[in-house]
Amino acid sequence: MNEYMNEYMKETNEALLHTYNQFPVVLDHGEGAYLYDTEGKKYLDFAAGYAVSSLGYGNQELNEALKAQIDKLFHTSNLYYNTVCGKAAEDLKRITGMDRIFFTNSGGEAVKGTLKAARKYAYKKGTGRYEFIAMKESFHGRSFGALSVTGHDPYRAPFEPLVPGVSFAEYNDLDSVKALVTDKTCAIILEPLQGEGGINLATEEFMKGIRKLCDEEGILMICDEVQCGMGRTGSMFTWQSYGIRPDIMSMAKAIGSGIPVGAFAMTEEIAKYSLEPGDHGTTYGGNPLACTAVSKTIEIFEKKNLVAHVQELGAYLTEKLEELKSECDCVKAVKGKGLMQGIQVTKPLSEITKEALKEGLLIIGAGNDVIRFVPPLIIEKEHVDEMIRILKKVL
């Protein structure tokens, strides 16, 4: 480790609030599926900035579009129309099948917006409903609103009491959800594929059961696609693979390929009775730079047919992880779908991720015992082979 790297880490540690357990590496630039540190060491990235960098690094088409927009206009406010926001919203409508879009700056903000939209719908309908049912081991963000529907006690405990009116059901257990329904239940919120909770994929029975329950009881269904959306699991959004449609959804991360942007979307029926002028807002959301990133990302996705690519590479990744499981006693299960997969292990996650870093592989944990694989969606089979080779050595 060179003097510059040590000095930069020292400077950073003395200036920033210590909210992250950072690895001892200073990243400098990236190309394709690889990142490089300040010493020139190359890392195969199977973390993608927590499933954000879907197009990898150094995509010239995206970069040129962003540079051009920076030279033109990158912020005004939502008091005025701009030439980019409307197109980005139409693009998201098209790929989600939803009717109304609200742009945010992050996934946590998007989730907060879905909760407010659901509460306002109930208020305007005069139902008196205000309660939410969320899932145990879920993760929806760290703001008070998003944290209130996050079902992981260590994240919640230091900040309680949080927003009242939230109860937690067992994931993939429809009876557990039904037992919590009251005449005050406003919405049920869930991730179709839990990321932080340990790469837990919803069953078809569970997703369709939730949709049916919501329809029968007059409850709204909210799908959080912040991590599992935007092609990550082999469909543009994971809920689409179940043949259902939520009333409201959140998205972020990969929709901007690394530019901070999120959004929540809803059907026209919900929008008619939901947020109005004065109910919700954002200073930066929907700015021209972020919206350029959204539209260009979608354009590249469709041009490269990345959803089909993820289906192919996801199947290959599953095959190779199953082979790894058969060879390594410490691997107990292969989980997930598409390019959002994981292996359940008996070794400490911190030990595995640190050793992988030394070998030039970036991976992250999920839950207490799962190694998560969320690489850029542009990877090829040789990248999977390289990852498996390194991981096998580490394990």
PLM regions with names:
Residues 2-395:
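Conserved N-terminal phosphate-binding loop of PLP-dependent enzymes in the Aspartate aminotransferase
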